[in-house]
Amino acid sequence: MDRVYEIPEEPNVDPVSSLEEDVIRGANPRFTFPFSILFSTFLYCGEAASALYMVRIYRKNSETYWMTYTFSFFMFSSIMVQLTLIFVHRDLAKDKPLSLFMHLILLGPVIRCLEAMIKYLTLWKKEEQEEPYVSLTRKKMLIDGEEVLIEWEVGHSIRTLAMHRNAYKRMSQIQAFLGSVPQLTYQLYVSLISAEVPLGRVVLMVFSLVSVTYGATLCNMLAIQIKYDDYKIRLGPLEVLCITIWRTLEITSRLLILVLFSATLKLKAVPFLVLNFLIILFEPWIKFWRSGAQMPNNIEKNFSRVGTLVVLISVTILYAGINFSCWSALQLRLADRDLVDKGQNWGHMGLHYSVRLVENVIMVLVFKFFGVKVLLNYCHSLIALQLIIAYLISIGFMLLFFQYLHPLRSLFTHNVVDYLHCVCCHQHPRTRVENSEPPFETEARQSVV
């Protein structure tokens, strides 16, 4: 994963006197080539082109339903992508007719990518010149296990390029979970019931799978940045590899189980899937209603109450789309000022994976016992076992990341092992604990838990 600008690994130790605390003056940030912007644009264009090609093929073969669903998934995600980029860049308050026109014809990511490349080339040509407009940024860093506060200057051009990067990160998540996930699931379903896989559909499924994996990986990184906004965070290649393997196994196993379950029950599977999605969708709103809190008004200063409500609904739909296929790594709380729970909520993570594991086992058992006409030449028991094992392995990589590879794991009050130990402690009968431990030790253990 690239960064628009990065801080040297060993900042120049130049303490600056402050009334509150000592600050280390960091070296000026070095801007890097925005590979993530190019990659996100490539995924968007590739998936859009392959989806439109399959729409043309389905129309030529008079397969109306397949054509309609394929085109609908493409259009919905593309429109949401355009709205996301317009919202992040605040284009409605600016006079940019060309950008708005490109968004209107669903080519907004392309023009934004060109703008980012032009900005990068401008920075590259003026690398040795000092910018007249700069701002100071302060972040905490963990250096040799010690927390230090670092301050550095960020130029206006670098900040603009960083805004492009952040916009594309959010765009990639919108595309992944509101477009690529349903597209990939549906194309897998069509391939399963039609018993043929043309090259165009393979290309579309590959683009969708890469988009989903990339979006889920970004979801983890953005979750860490949101929870630890005061810290400068670095993820090394090993951490990114662990997250990628975890997310790939989790998403592929989950989607394959959904496809096999849907192919087995046909229309009978629709109520179960719709109910599952609606529970995730309305859960944050039910908690918000029960809390009795006011609707947050700090999302955008120029937004009316209706505009704020539209943004909250869009965020909730994205949150439900993420949790339907994988863990969102964040818990949405509409009653909070920041809209998310910034705590390390092990209980929410454990509940999500426990419920999803039970769901996957149930759907796999339905496929095993009732999927007579699905995959006639394959052993259903072996397929079911492999899918459950793949999902369990993804959980193992998730636990590995949080226990050993999380960049700020030293800030955890409790880690994965502590949480599992607490769960095991609660499973013991209380009478046995009371009889085997002195009162002082019992109170101490309960306080730790």
Swiss-Prot record:
The chain crosses the membrane at residues 35-55, 68-88, 98-118, 174-194, 202-222, 241-261, 269-289, 306-326, 357-377, 382-402. GO terms for cellular component: plasma membrane. Keywords: Cell membrane, Membrane, Transmembrane, Transmembrane helix. It comes from the Eukaryota. The keyword Membrane applies. It is found in: Cell membrane. Expressed predominantly in the placenta, in syncytiotrophoblasts. Moderate levels in the adrenal gland, low levels in the trachea and very low levels in the bone marrow. It is a multi-pass membrane protein. The keyword Transmembrane applies. Belongs to the XK family. This is XK-related protein 2. The lineage of its organism: Eukaryota, Metazoa, Chordata, Craniata, Vertebrata.
